[in-house]
């Protein structure tokens, strides 16, 4: 019997759900990554690109805390939730061992999301490593609205590019690799599309050095930019304070955000107030 309950949290924007989801498939897409497809007997809750899930890892004494994982994709027709998992520790390795038919307890959806694209807006989605995960869902949602997304994906080598064929289904996909084995050689900020085309907004997720470089580029070009931070998280609700990040109280320091007070900077919980932030608020 599926256990379903509503969770009231500090984040009032969307209701949170505690669900026992059924594993539909686990696909090894890379030596360090698996794609977990989950389903439920009832329609999955509303989720927006950029939000994440806290999953409970059962059967492992060293994984008391839940693991935060970005929402990779939501297939409404098949009623599936996709999670792209990097196997970096005991907890995520345990998740990679799940089999079809197993149950995974999930708290979702958590955090905020990327700014929804508007008609006529040209949006560039830049990702690296497992940070490409939330951008797939973002691109799919844009396509559903008749807006063509542009993806710029970076990796060390061609074999490290994740889900590239699926990204190509939802928009234009450009690639950089550090060794030049696929796409243009170098980092995402070196790609020629940044010089050849003009974008209204950039959404990015991936390694912090990459996102900082993207933020610098956006500032130089006067492009709106938001980044999804990957701080260590535990509760996902803003209670444990382990994901705190110091940010500016406002974007321009002249019109303070009324939600905060007490100076030019403030501490926020990435899990509750983020993970997506306007880069002008970040102390980068």
Predicted regions and their residues:
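Local cysteine-cluster metal-coordination motifs and their immediate loop/turn environment
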Residues: 208, 230-249, 264-275
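Ferredoxin-reductase
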Residues: 15-100
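FNR/FR-type flavoprotein reductase catalytic core
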Residues: 90-234
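Short, surface-exposed secondary-structure boundary micro-motifs
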Residues: 58-60, 109, 248
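Short, positively charged and aromatic/hydrophobic N-terminal segments
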Residues: 5, 9-10
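Intrinsically disordered, low-complexity terminal tails and inter-domain linkers enriched
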Residues: 249-263
């Amino acid at each position: 019997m599926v256990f379903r309950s509503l969770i009231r949290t500090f984040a009032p924007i969307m209701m949170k759900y505690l669900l026992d989801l059924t594993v539909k498939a686990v696909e090894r897409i890379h030596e360090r990554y698996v794609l977990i497809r989950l389903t439920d007997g009832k329609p999955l809750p509303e989720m927006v690109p950029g939000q994440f899930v806290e999953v409970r890892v059962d059967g492992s004494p060293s994984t008391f805390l839940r693991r935060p994982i970005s929402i990779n994709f939501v297939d409404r027709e098949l009623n599936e939730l996709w999670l792209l998992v990097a196997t970096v520790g005991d907890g995520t390795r345990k998740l990679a061992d799940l089999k079809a038919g197993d149950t995974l307890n999930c708290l979702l959806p958590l955090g905020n999301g990327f700014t929804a694209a508007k008609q006529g807006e040209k949006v560039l989605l830049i990702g690296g490593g497992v940070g490409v995960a939330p951008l797939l869902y973002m691109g799919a949602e844009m396509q559903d609205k008749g807006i063509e997304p542009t993806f710029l994906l970076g990796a060390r080598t061609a074999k490290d590019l994740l889900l590239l064929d699926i990204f190509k289904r939802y928009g234009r996909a450009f690639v950089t690799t550090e060794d030049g084995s696929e796409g243009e050689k170098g980092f995402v900020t070196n790609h020629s599309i940044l010089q050849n085309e003009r974008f209204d907004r950039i959404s990015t997720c991936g390694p912090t050095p990459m996102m900082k470089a993207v933020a610098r580029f956006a500032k130089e070009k006067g492009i709106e930019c938001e980044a999804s931070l990957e701080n260590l998280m535990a509760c996902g609700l803003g209670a444990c304070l382990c994901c705190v990040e110091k940010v500016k109280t406002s974007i321009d320091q002249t019109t303070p955000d009324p939600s905060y007070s007490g100076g030019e900077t403030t501490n926020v919980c990435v899990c509750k107030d983020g993970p997506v932030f306007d880069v002008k608020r970040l102390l980068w």
